[in-house]
Amino acid sequence: MGTRVRFSFCGIAGVCLLALGFLVSCSLQSSRSATKKSEARRTSYRIGLMTSTGS
């Protein structure tokens, strides 16, 4: 039970780090083009859905 909790926590932390890095890169791109902003928001929302369903 303990190892399972630790694994899920590590997975959530890893996904959060990936999403953070992805959002940072998307925000850097969106500063160049405004159309990328809504695209980044949509993908971040999709990542959030995947994280909630995966955990």
Curated annotation (Swiss-Prot):
Residues 1-30 form the signal peptide. Keywords: Signal. PROSITE patterns: PROKAR_LIPOPROTEIN. This is Protein Tp75.
